[in-house]
Every structure is written in structure tokens, then in C-alpha cells.
Amino acid sequence: MPKIYFHVDVNSAFLSWSALKALQGGSTVDLRTIPAVVGGDEAKRHGVVLAKSTPAKKFGIQTGESLFAARVKCPGLTVVPPDFDLYVKNSKALIQILNDYTPDVEQYSIDEAFLDMTGTEALFGPPLTAAHTIRRRVRRELGFTVNVGIAPNRLLAKMASDFEKPDRVHTLYKYEVETKMWPLPVGDLFGVGPSAAKRLNSCGIYTIGDLARLERDTAVRLFGSRGDTLWNYANGREADPVTKQRTRDNSYGNSVTMPRDLARPEDADATMLALCDSVGRRLRADGKTARVVTVQLVDNAFRRTSHQTTLPNPTNSTDRLYHVAIELMRQMWPQRPVRLVGVSAEKTGEDNFEQMDLFTDAARIDKQEKLDRAADALRKKFGGAAVTRATLLSPDTRKPEALSAAKEREKDKK
């Protein structure tokens, strides 16, 4: 039976979700219809652009650039702060809907997922019919729009979902690759970043078709093993199956795809802090502590690596989770640049008390618990963005508020 995959991608996720929240709160202006961005500290004009509206794009505003630069381009720009709790809530709602159509759902990032729809035609009709059903249901029930790509493998499904937006369904079958994908700039190929695109251009490779028509050996000679991978991608070949999103009742986790590849572990410190902050917050909200911390990294060759450690005492402290995760991340950092960072807290139990030994700094732990509780109380009363760690407001793009960013283009698990 021929395989059929869907790639479901939320259109301008963070901006759309912020717009919906504002409208539900009584705003008469839809952020999606005006020059608006999701960014850092508006009062201090710190940080970077994490997501932008279609009108903002017309001013040349780019995801990842500083808010200062964005305001130069558009002085009347509306800036709203990031709200990771809001993103997690909407992401969960999306995945809940997708799980109604197949048990094989792989959440690729907070705002996109792959579905193995093979063999579901008797239930939901032909692929195009099923895709439009999902698209319309998300818009009707959740209030935001998605693109759905349909293809015989994940790679082509993802490429298809990036065609014309928003709120569209596109196919990219093998027989359509030459006409639909090959004419695109090589920089549009999945896995080709700006630096790789420049190098390909310097070799006379400007379109995906140019790369596809190269001799395979030539691609390998020019770009090594990465050249072989990209050559296969350009020819529409990708064999990885959808990995079913396992529901782990005792696991809390988040991951994020970065807006650009990270060469050094310290480049991911702020992102890891934000992820641990979110995980710790949800553990505390549910009255849970975790004994196992797992860190996952994906490099720019799409190789996944994960390390975990068992804590001597369970915890839900953001500070403790962060320091353990940072140590793991430094131990496992791969040779190639990293494109995805994730952390999960597992083997959870009821939050009773933390057993201490002679070497435990009781005063420090007590202080951290009070800080966590105070921050949680403020967020509960005033919203998820009420308290933001200073590190995450840095204008230095090495400290990604990229957490929230990474996507306009590009897991929360519980």
C-alpha cells in the first residue's frame, strides 16, 4: 500500500496565537491584520523578532532581527511579548485534534506535526478530502489556520506545506517533484540554511533542480556526506517513518527548533533555561516532582542524541532542572552545529518534600522554592508572560528568545 503522510504546520503560529488571545480578551484589533510582531521586552525595546504578521513582512521585517531594526523599518510596529504557556496550550489543542485522524502522529515542533495517514481512506476519504477536513476543523474549533502538505514521505510533505500560505492544502507526489519543487531556490530545500545556500550558489547550484540533476558522486565530492543527504532530498527521497508520539504519563517536556544552527553549547544556555522554566512550572502546577532529566539534541544532519541522568532526590525546581540539563548538554554536544534542543523531566511522583543530605544547601533550596512559588503565583494571576527571566530579554540573539522563535518556519509532551 502506498504511503501517505501529512505535514500540518500552523501559519505564523506565535503571532496567530497571540492575536487570538488578544481578541478573546476584548481587543478590537486582529494583530494578524496590522504590522505586528511577537518580540522581547516592549518597554525596553530589547530582544528579537520571534514572529511577524503578513503586513509586517511587507516592511521587510525578518524573524530573528532586533526589535530596534524592526522599528526602524516600521515605526508604528505593534510588539507583543512572547507567552510560551500560551503556545503550549494551543499546541496541545492542535495535537489533540490530529490524534483523532491517526494514531501515528509525530510532533516535530511546537507548531507542526507529521501524520502517517496510510490506510485511513476508508475512514476519512481521499487524502485531499481528509486534509481539508483537518484544516477546516482546526480553523473552526481553535480559531487559527494551518497548511497541510500531502506526500508519499515526510520530506515532501513538509516541502508541500511550505507552498502558498495561509490556510492551504498542497500535494507533492513523486511525479510532481520536477514541476513543483525543482524550480524553487535551493535555499528553500529542507535542511539548506543560508550559509549552505551561499556555498551551493558559489558552485552554480541555484535551484533545487540544479542540485537534483548533479551526479550523486559530484554532490558527495563537493559537500561530503551532507551532500549525499541533500542530493537525496532534492530528488524527493527520505525514508524515515513517522515516529509515533508516545504519551508518557510520567513525563513533562519541551523542545524547540532554533532559527539558526548553534555551534557551541553556551549558545543554547538561554533556550535551555526557558525550556526548564516551562517544564518546572508545569510540574509545580500539577504537584509533581521528577527524578530523571533527559536532554535531546538534533544536529544539522538531523542526527538525534539524548542523554539522561537520575537525580539523588526528585525535584521540580527550575534552577535544579536547568543546572542538570546544562551539564548534560555540555557532555553530549555533537561535533556538528545543533538545530533542535529539548529537555524532559521523567519518573514523576507527588511533590511531598525533598530529602536532603549533609551536602545540601538547605537555605539556597528554600530560597529557590520561594522564588518559584512567587513567580508561579504572578503568572497565574497576570498571565504566562508576567514574569520573564532577565536572561531571556537579552538583545543578544545568541540567547534566543529564539526559544519562542525558531518558528515562524520551523514538543511539548506531557
Specify the residue positions occupied by each region the protein language model found.
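DNA-contacting surface of Y-family translesion DNA polymerases
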Residues: 188, 196-338
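Short, charged/polar surface micro-motifs in flexible loops or helix N-caps
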Residues: 11-13, 42-45, 300-304, 348-351
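C-terminal hydrophobic structural anchor segments
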Residues: 315, 320-380
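Gly/Gly-Pro- and Ser/Thr-rich, intrinsically disordered tail segments characteristic of DNA damage-repair
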Residues: 1-232, 281, 365-414
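A glycine-rich phosphate-binding loop feature that marks nucleotide/adenosyl-phosphate handling sites
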Residues: 152-155, 234-236, 289-300, 338-349, ...
